[in-house]
Amino acid sequence: MAHWTIEQEEAINARNSNLLVAAAAGSGKTTVLVERIIQLVLRDRIDIDRLLIVTFTQAAAGEMRERINAAFFKELEKGREDGHLRRQLYLLNRSSISTIHAFCSDVVRQHFHLVNIDPHFRIADSTETELIKMEVLEELLDGEYEKGNDGFLDLVEAFGSNKDDKPLEALILRLHSFIQSHPQPLSWLEEKIDNLALGEDNWAENPWASELSQQIKIELSAAQDILNQALKLSNKAGGPRGYLEAIESDQKWVELLLKAADQGLPVLYSCLQQLSFTRLGRVSRDVDENLKNQVKILRDESKKILNAINSLLGRDPLEYLQDLNEIYSLMKYLGEIIQSFAEIYQEKKREKGIVDFNDLEHLALQILSNEAVAREYRDYYSYLFIDEYQDSNLVQETILNYIKKEDNLFMVGDVKQSIYRFRLADPSLFLEKQKSYPLQDGSVNRRVDLNKNFRSHPEILNAVNYIFRHLMSEELGEIDYDEKSYLYPGLNTGQELKYQEIDKASSQEGKEKENTAKRVEICILENNPDLITKLEENETEEREIPGEAENDFIERIIEMDNTEIEALLIAQKIRQLIQEDIYDPELQCMRKIEYRDMVILLRATRNSAGIFMEQLSAEGIPVYADASSGYFDTLELNLFINLLRLIDNKRQDIALLSVMRSPIGGFSIDDFIKIRTKLIPRREKQPYSFYEAMEFYMEDNNDDLKDRLVFFIQRLKEWELESRIMALDEFMGKLFMDTGYYYYAGAMPGGGQRQANLRILLHRAREFQKSSFKGLFSFIKYIEKIKSSGSDMGNACIIGENDNVVRIMSIHKSKGLEFPVVILGGLGKNFNIRDSNENVLLHRKLGIGPRYINTQLRTYHDTIARLAIKNRIKLENLAEEMRILYVACTRPQEKLIMVGTTRQLESAWRRWSQPVNSYNQSRARSFLDWLIPIIMRHKKEGQYLREIAGGDWDREILWEDESRWKVKLISPWQLTAEEIRKKEEKYEWERLLEQGGYSCPSAESEEIIKRLNWKYPYQEAENIPAKLSVSQVSQISSGYLEDGAADTFLTRVPAFLSGEKDKKTRLSPADKGSIVHLVMQNIDYRRVSREDSINQQLGEMVEREILTSEQLAVVEVNKIWRFFQTKLGQRVLQAKWLFREAPFNLLIAASEVFPALESQEELLIQGIIDLYFYEGEDIVLLDFKSDIVHHKSEEEILAPYRVQLKLYKRALENITDHRVKESYLYFFDLNRAIRV
């Protein structure tokens, strides 16, 4: 951003305060955060390692570090010679820019003795911890069954199932997981369970009654609004005045109930017992039937609300109290079970030397509760930065409160984008500060609002503001979307003017063109099969296309579900968009829309992404889905995992038949039949498994099938033996080669994707080996656990960010991203409310809410605690869905298209015509139920929808707004007509080709011939690469590539094709050299005082997972120590400014590398300089070598590296504008530095 806004400057420059920055979507929060850090370092002279910067993800931490690094280099490029600045480049590598878990890990490793934990602990992944939890559950429940305690048996009876204890196990795991978001998990659980033991004397203090009263008041207010509307219609000319008495009576009842709700549930219950409704009076014959019917509908709706409230409080509050007292002992025992589970789980992890992410937070919390340790961190860090603060939880908040000073906290985020409640994020932490922190300067706690949007076109911002002004409220969405929350255009003046010119030009082409130019579009698709079947009745045109093909397509439309038909619509929409122009802010001109400009956002991709991919691919649209599922369902994974299962246990029919029928086995269905049928007359009983049938067949027969079976089983036995003695990843890699399956998968359609999926499986096996579980059986169990727990992932990503494809992703994954065109699909899908259907509900404030279950009578009903928590969870889930919708609507830069499907449009119109208020919005089933009622009330743009919906629309309830909407109601016939038109075109082309009646005009023929005969004018440059590494240039220049070697270099034959066999050694010389370079890159030179100090640092590198224990074993510490004892090593240790692993790009003439080349082509040379340091104003350059060279002469040693050092020197002098006075190669094999 060239210019900072006033609010951005405040966020950057404010000091001596705790600052909450409420940064709306697209407001440049990361840029502001980085600039504040830069100013603290450059202007306030604070070292970068004295700032603690906590990000939400590792990727965000990496991006933050890169931005800061780039900003430092930018200052250096300006000619700023500042020792403090150069020091920051050195300190940046060890600065505290990380996730909260990485910070907690550092705290625990530094103070492990305070919590009695092994400092070499490993962080387990989620699947490993799930497997341990299952072990713990089995051990725990077996022990409880042995005890035979009545309390436990009651628990099983209440929360188990008729078949097994799975529901009880799931309950224990869910409660244990939930309480981890509290600083004192088990204490919190005990306290909340004890709250169930209420007495009559403290009944009024319970939080559940208050929660229910608030919800009932919302519903009563809705009934009041409905009755007011009915009263207004009744008083109109022609209105049903005979209904006034009943409506006014209902109004009095509502007022009475509202007052009773303020006095508590017992009073409200008594009042509801007396509730009665007056019958509607007679009306005159000349009454307006339309008004009469509307009033009756409204009255019935208000009665429905009042009856629902009466049902909710259908029992005396004292009966609810009795329920809680009776269920208390059961929940108390459940609490004890969870405490036992937590203790055993912790002990299991301690034995295995692992921790999970929750452990990191709680251990860090325990350590920081020690005042001396907390003071140490408070004194060290000058400022604390928390990115994405809206996604914090109470544990993380408590950790940071321990180490913050009175006025050094900087929190940035947007509560409207808090969409991680399922990860136990607590947006109330942000909301509480947002309400309490003043905007004025001078307070130790203050707030800055960033609401200028630098991403989206103003027309999109207007639409977003219009929707959420009428949707997001404190009552339902947990925040009022008012003027302080609006998104305001932040684009620079030049760009705004350009947009105005484009929009003006579009609008001058007529009203139809003006509608097309609208940047926000909503499409309502009615997928009603009954409507589609009328196509044949209504369609009377004669068509050239055969009727059978048309009927087939109509039949296909009828069979499509909502997702499929929506995908078809979006595919058609993309085909239209690809012909349109779009403004490119970077190019500052109009250009054609490309596929890469478009993204399809879905609420969830698990069951939908595959359908969208299939439909778009069928339409010839290149597409990639960033899905979170489907990986283990792919053909290549299914077969290979079946092979692993078979090797582990041959008596598994499904796995066995799968592998035998595949190219790995090569058997046919006829072979299977032959194996089975040969046994029928000879055996008294059929074999238990197909493997046994194979064994019997081999005993009784001597033919080709027997030979193949013998060979197949022998291979299985060999693999079984190898699986026991080889490392898992090595064994799987060998299976790839032995079966040829990796290359077979690569030859299948989508082979690149399939091979990438197999490589991911190999990587998972490699990671699994680091866990506490070992062996093929455990790995298969690990994979099955991932699948059964719903932790499946999407296919491996094989595309880059610049590939020209339409992307499909979830709204969650799109957070923080932006796209020129966003298509938001699935708006008609129902919200997921499964988490409010559990037998025991949990809430961070309301506590625990169980159902009352009578195990003798096998009956159950809701306790007052569950009723209150269920209601609160529903409202919080709806608030989350609102924020998810907000995130989706704020991703586009130029165009937003929203698509939703409904099957019952008639009933939807009745629902959407209801008043827009919190009550009706709380009953929404989908995003469409929120969007359409609001758009219908747009005075101008909603007219189209109001005309279709019908009814009497009072102009007082319509809203004037500057937002512009393109609203379309699309029937299945429109989709069908488009597809039939395409089929007609195809049929016509086929007819012409068959008749031979089509030929190209002569001018077109000449152009085709001209293009076919065209030759590329720069053929000599075709074999020259665009870029080379320094090592490759050195090889070429030093004669290592002789005649014809350039071709070999450019088209290297893979090892598996050249016949070379894989090395059996685990670490090659090149690997060992990389390890030495890794050590020299990460070792802290300031701590090098003796050989032991290097050993200590190497141990720390293993702990920090920079090195593995296998890699550590090959490091020759004595050789590293000898380097530091040399004169050059001493100069390195004494250097004030020292830089390691410095990457560079250098553009040179291609003829410098390939002298025979006559063209003026250029080459990009890439390299990484191991180390350089300053002595005065000059630079000393050093490159480490681990080659075995003691048998060579000095000239032979230096020959391959002269060009390399020359390029390093040239690049350094260009970048730094300082002279390189000396260049050295240090050979660890010689323990000697050689000057070049």
Swiss-Prot record:
Keywords: ATP-binding, DNA damage, DNA repair, DNA-binding, Exonuclease, Helicase, Hydrolase, Isomerase, Nuclease, Nucleotide-binding. It catalyses: Couples ATP hydrolysis with the unwinding of duplex DNA by translocating in the 3'-5' direction; ATP + H2O = ADP + phosphate + H(+). This is ATP-dependent helicase/nuclease subunit A. GO terms for molecular function: 3'-5' DNA helicase activity; 3'-5' exonuclease activity; ATP binding; ATP hydrolysis activity; double-stranded DNA binding. GO terms for biological process: double-strand break repair via homologous recombination. Pfam families: PDDEXK_1, UvrD-helicase, UvrD_C. Disulfide bonds: none annotated. GO terms for cellular component: cytosol; DNA helicase complex. Belongs to the helicase family. AddA subfamily. Gene3D superfamilies: 3.90.320.10, P-loop containing nucleotide triphosphate hydrolases (3.40.50.300). Its cofactor is Mg(2+). The lineage of its organism: Bacteria, Bacillati, Bacillota, Clostridia, Eubacteriales.
